[in-house]
Each structure stands twice: as structure tokens, then as C-alpha cells.
Amino acid sequence: MSKHSLIENLKEQIEPIAEGLDYELYHIEFVKEGKENYLRIYIDSENGVSLEGCEKVSRAVSELLDDIDPIQESYYLEVSSPGIDRVLYTDKHLEKYKGYNIVLNLYSAIDKKKKYEGELVDFNENEIDIKVEENIVTIPREKISKTTLKGEL
């Protein structure tokens, strides 16, 4: 099973568990760091994410993973909030944070810049519009390596 198929399969099975515990499944990733593998599950809610909430989701997901055993190699399971400087992965995430400040990291420079920061104004399947100072800047999505919410307390 490919990594993409694994993640999609896990999303389908973990999403109802998270929702049953009053959390949104924000993102899942399976990564190798050094010699260790990590299955990271990010959850969110309108009221924030507590350590207790992460523990509840972790226990429920751990039971599921023990039952279905989708990953052959050893790994660590981590459940956490996406954090204040969260990566915006989906159109749903972008829609939620319209009007907020974001950071766009680019694969290659546009107008000699590889990083743009500004207010998320709009987006479509091809581009993202941000307000930088008083100007609207349109960045093609294929040029964007990472979109992050600019955390502000």
C-alpha cells in the first residue's frame, strides 16, 4: 500500500473517531525522522485542544490501529493540535482562515521573493490572493511549497 493510500484509508477510519470525541481531524502524516517512523494525527476544535483531548483521541485511535494493523513497520503514534502557526493543507483550511495573516513559502522566487506574508483575501484551485501592505498579490498555487497561518496571540 502506498503512503498516500495508507493516509487516505486512515483518514476514513479516524475521522469518525475524532468527531465522536468532538474533534475535527485536521491532518494525518506518516513520516520518517532519523531511524524512527511517526504517525502524526492533528486534531482541532472550536474550543481548542487540551492534553486530555489528545489522550482520549490517542487511546481510541491506538485501539483501532491495533485492530486493523495497517502499518507493518514499527512507529510512534502522536496526537496533537496543529498549533497556532498551523500549516493550511486544504481548501477547507483556507476558507476558515480568510481574513487572517498567512505566510506563503514558494519553490522559486517571484519578483525576487521566495516568501510572502499578508492577509488571505481569496483563493481558487489555481491561485491564492493575499494583501501585502495595500496591494493584492496573486500567487499561483503550483509555486507554493507551504501555506502557514501566521500565529498571532
UniProtKB/Swiss-Prot annotation:
Keywords: Cytoplasm, Ribosome biogenesis. It comes from the Bacteria. It is found in: Cytoplasm. Its main location: cytoplasm. GO terms for biological process: ribosomal small subunit assembly; translation. One of its GO terms (cellular component) is cytosol. PANTHER family: RIBOSOME MATURATION FACTOR RIMP. NCBIfam families: PRK00092.3-1. Required for maturation of 30S ribosomal subunits. Belongs to the RimP family. This is Ribosome maturation factor RimP. It comes from Clostridium botulinum (strain Langeland / NCTC 10281 / Type F).
